[in-house]
Amino acid sequence: MSSYIVHRQNITRKEQSTIYWVNVLLSMLTGLLLVAIAWPISWFYHLPQLGGLIMLTSLNFLVLGSLSQYQAHFIKAKRMILLAKIEMVTKFLAFAFTVILLYYSPLGVSAVILGLFANAALRIGCMIWFGDKSWRPTFEFDQGTFYSSLKYGIYQLGSQTINQLRTQADSLIVGKVMGAELLGVYSLAKELILQPLKLVTPVINRLALPRFAEKQHDPVRLQQLFLKGTFVIMLFSAIMYLAIGILSPVIVRVLYGPAHEAVGQLIPLMLLFGMLRPMGGLTGAISQANGRTNVEFYWNVVASIIVVLVLASVWIWPQVEYVALTLSISQVLISVFAHPFFIKPVIGIRFLPYARQWISVSAVFVGIIALVSHYNLFIMPEWFSRWL
């Protein structure tokens, strides 16, 4: 719901306060829900200590609702550099706090959870201190804003939930069809592909969301921004994943050790998936900026159907290499079908201008990776045997 503030460019103090208190209330209700289910979960898993840890985790929700609102204000005001500085400093302080607790107290896992809470509390404290006073909420409520922001937030939450389930569908099938051993190999390869996305996607959203929101009433300029953004992101993503692909034998040896070199055989098959996936951050940002989270939700349903249909073929070819390849196949299909189901309804761009931004880059990327794989042009760990 925090991105609703960015979408609503001109918002009154009363409307802003309404969104703030609704977000805080929902955050606290989520925390109470965690407290309520803590003991049933610990009983189900026969781990008595788990209940206390889950209840301790609920502390985070005391500040997360407020934190997300202030973060949205920083993004809307394009104060990303200050926001990044706050996050780096508070993460370092929270890390130091966690290490001290682990070293000088018997808290164990609880120290890590308290470290997360300390990080959130420090961040909101710094954001309040460095943020504008006009961002601070008042005790006012606007019913119209409440309903519109709630509708916006529910669709966005639904989209994120479906997206997470879709991301894990392949792992469920590998575990069911091929067993735990191959699931372990597959999961390590996929995690290596996903890790850069966890860093890149939030940056894309933070940079794109306020700019798209500013131009939401200027369709021509919005289309130009989207097309330019797509091309730049694809170019950056292609270079990043090309480097990961060529260095994959070394990366696997360093991260997983020589016993898991089978992981490296799956990575080239997943590279196109990783390269194309950052486009999802851009499409998500443009739907949120235009207040079209309902279209984003329905598109995620369609994308999930595409993934399930492609994954269904795994029962015909139950090979872990084929499952790795289906990730890339699914992402290509999602990139194509995103146009009629999502991009055209939201910003009205024709297919050819959209396709030109990523198909040519993807074709060159696939060609280079194919040549590297065919002629075994990977950088090998044996070249660095003195250090590895």
Swiss-Prot record:
Pathway assignment: Glycan metabolism; exopolysaccharide biosynthesis
Keywords: Cell membrane, Exopolysaccharide synthesis, Membrane, Transmembrane, Transmembrane helix, Virulence
Gene Ontology cellular component list: plasma membrane
Gene Ontology BP annotations: polysaccharide biosynthetic process
Transmembrane region(s): 24-44, 47-67, 97-117, 231-251, 297-317, 359-379
Record membrane topology: Multi-pass membrane protein
Localization in the cell: Cell membrane
Keyword hit for Transmembrane: yes
Chief location category: membrane
Protein function: Involved in the biosynthesis of amylovoran which functions as a virulence factor.
Family under the similarity heading: Belongs to the polysaccharide synthase family.
Protein's UniProt name: Amylovoran biosynthesis protein AmsL
